């Protein structure tokens, strides 16, 4: 319809010109001009339908989405362990990591430590919080370089690993801060690779969506990456067992408004992954 309207207008305008000018001199040029003009207008109209407009932002999303009252920084570690070494790896982690957590000279807290049950096998996941942001992280790293027990632990650990990676994260302002909880629980870490430029939209939608997922106290924490793999979001949930997880997730679909928020957040995702994790005995999150 729009294309036919544009062509009709172009033809009428061109016809008026032809009546006032010599047909031999103007006709070829007018045909070329009206054809290219119509195509460009039609292309512009079509682009307006399919190209999503992104509003300009006046601040970094880390400032817009993170908690203002704290300067906490989180480190998420993924360690892929040799299958035959997992038991020994867990043993040395449970001996050394709690000592760092309990030492008041280290401005950091071990939030949780797990083995992946479903997902990447023979994997350990550790979540640390640094009270004071990047300066606290630097202070801890410098002190650990002088900690002989930790250096021995790191050397022994390196012989047990196949690979490892980490990310530095900030917490969403609308999520609970992770606090120790009693068990037994299983934990789900849902990780989302977002499309670049969509973090603000994700935060806006989930600021409303989180209220649908707090009835069972299952929401542990929500984070977004600052260093490492960027535009990554991690949601951490706690459930009594897998059946409880299934029941809680199904119940959300019966709450008015949940399906609409899911509808709008799904297009923001490039890739997603779910890990079901079991806490180690020394994990503050049980």
Curated annotation (Swiss-Prot):
What GO terms fall under cellular component here?
mitochondrial matrix; mitochondrial outer membrane; mitochondrion
Alphabetically list the UniProt keywords.
Answer: Autophagy, Mitochondrion, Transit peptide
Q: What is the lineage of its organism?
A: Eukaryota, Metazoa, Chordata, Craniata, Vertebrata
Point out the transit peptide region.
1-23
Q: How does it assemble?
A: Interacts with CALCOCO2/NDP52, NBR1, SQSTM1/p62, TAX1BP1 and WDFY3/ALFY. Interacts with ATG8 family proteins (MAP1LC3A, MAP1LC3B, MAP1LC3C, GABARAP, GABARAPL1 and GABARAPL2). Interacts with VDAC1.
Query: Found in which tissues?
Result: Widely expressed. Most abundant in heart and skeletal muscle.
Q: Which gene encodes it?
A: NIPSNAP2
Q: Which InterPro entries match?
A: Dimeric_a/b-barrel, NIPSNAP, NipSnap_domain
A molecular function (GO) term: protein-macromolecule adaptor activity
Gene3D superfamilies tied to this protein: 3.30.70.100
For this UniProt entry, what is the primary localization, expressed as one broad class?
A: mitochondrion
| Name the record gives this protein | Protein NipSnap homolog 2
| Localization in the cell | Mitochondrion matrix
Sorted alphabetically, the Gene Ontology BP terms of this entry are: mitochondrion organization; mitophagy; oxidative phosphorylation; positive regulation of high voltage-gated calcium channel activity
This chain's function reads: Protein involved in mitophagy by facilitating recruitment of the autophagy machinery required for clearance of damaged mitochondria. Accumulates on the mitochondria surface in response to mitochondrial depolarization and acts as a 'eat me' signal by recruiting proteins involved in selective autophagy, such as autophagy receptors (CALCOCO2/NDP52, NBR1, SQSTM1/p62, TAX1BP1 and WDFY3/ALFY) and ATG8 family proteins (MAP1LC3A, MAP1LC3B, MAP1LC3C, GABARAP, GABARAPL1 and GABARAPL2).
Q: Does the keyword Transit peptide apply?
A: yes
Q: Which organism is it from?
A: Homo sapiens (Human)
Q: Of which family is this protein a member?
A: Belongs to the NipSnap family.
